[in-house]
């Protein structure tokens, strides 16, 4: 069942890849870049770090991380969508960070890396689309070095009574309409709004981090809780 789900979601992202960046800007009204910038400000990345960016999509966060590094530091961007990775490679070349970026196709729930490999793992707007989120967090914990961190930027759910109905209306009605108007992909963006609406709250995601073994778990909310950055540290030995 999980493999079938993953195959279907992969096909969806293969389909929306050509419009992905433009639609992200439209749906978030450009705020996703601000969220990522604020999240990056809390990472304090060493210039020689080895970083894994999961569900890297078209590579925006991968490139932003690479710009903070110098050799031998590097970022591996992993995604299951070949069309997304093709677009990411074009950006990597344009931004002149190809010496610090390696793009790889793979499954975030079964990472093809040894234990204790990375100084940092990031995942942006990808965790909610995985069929087994707990397995993904367990895998991330495995490949992190002791004392290293996971940083997850993801959509969340506002809990303020005046904000939540507006948020639900926007994702239920407006987002699929944007998909139809700007990308001719109503069904695809109907699915994406469902994963957003039904994903864990920021409190629940913090609990999931703790259940996977992460320590010092904390989060920062954006736009009244429409998105949140979560941080967790692997136990230092």
Curated annotation (Swiss-Prot):
Keyword Transferase: yes
Keywords from the UniProt entry: Menaquinone biosynthesis, Methyltransferase, S-adenosyl-L-methionine, Transferase
Keyword check for Cell cycle: no
Binding site for S-adenosyl-L-methionine: 58, 79, 107-108
EC category name: transferase
Protein origin, superkingdom: Bacteria
Enzyme Commission number(s) of this protein: 2.1.1.163
Pathway the protein takes part in: Quinol/quinone metabolism; menaquinone biosynthesis; menaquinol from 1,4-dihydroxy-2-naphthoate: step 2/2
A single BP term in Gene Ontology: methylation
Gene Ontology MF: a single term: demethylmenaquinone methyltransferase activity
Reaction equation(s) it catalyzes: a 2-demethylmenaquinol + S-adenosyl-L-methionine = a menaquinol + S-adenosyl-L-homocysteine + H(+)
Ranges that cross the membrane: none
Matches recorded under Pfam families: Ubie_methyltran
UniProt family annotation: Belongs to the class I-like SAM-binding methyltransferase superfamily. MenG/UbiE family.
PANTHER family: 2-METHOXY-6-POLYPRENYL-1,4-BENZOQUINOL METHYLASE, MITOCHONDRIAL (PTHR43591:SF24), METHYLTRANSFERASE (PTHR43591)
Annotated function: Methyltransferase required for the conversion of demethylmenaquinol (DMKH2) to menaquinol (MKH2).
Name used for this protein in its record: Demethylmenaquinone methyltransferase
């Amino acid at each position: 069942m999980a493999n079938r789900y993953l195959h279907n979601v992969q096909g969806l992202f293969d389909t929306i890849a050509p419009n992905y960046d433009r639609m992200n800007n439209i749906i978030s009204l450009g705020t996703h870049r601000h969220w990522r910038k604020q999240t990056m400000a809390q990472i304090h990345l060493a210039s020689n770090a080895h970083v894994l960016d999961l569900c890297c999509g078209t590579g925006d966060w991968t490139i932003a991380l690479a710009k903070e590094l110098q050799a031998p530091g590097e970022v591996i961007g992993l995604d299951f969508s070949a069309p997304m990775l093709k677009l990411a490679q074009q950006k990597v070349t344009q931004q002149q960070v190809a010496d610090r970026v390696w793009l790889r196709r793979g499954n975030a729930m079964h990472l093809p890396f040894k234990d204790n490999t990375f100084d940092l793992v990031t995942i942006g707007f990808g965790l909610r689309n995985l069929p087994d989120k707990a397995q993904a967090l367990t895998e991330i914990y495995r490949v992190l070095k002791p004392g290293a961190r996971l940083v997850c930027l993801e959509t969340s759910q506002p809990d303020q009574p005046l904000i939540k109905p507006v948020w639900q209306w926007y994702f239920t009605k407006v987002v699929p309409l944007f998909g139809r108007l700007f990308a001719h992909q109503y069904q695809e963006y109907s699915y994406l709004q469902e994963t957003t609406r039904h994903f864990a709250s920021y409190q629940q995601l913090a609990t999931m981090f703790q259940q996977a073994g992460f320590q010092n778990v904390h989060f920062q909310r954006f736009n009244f809780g429409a998105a949140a950055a979560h941080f967790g540290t692997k136990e230092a030995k």
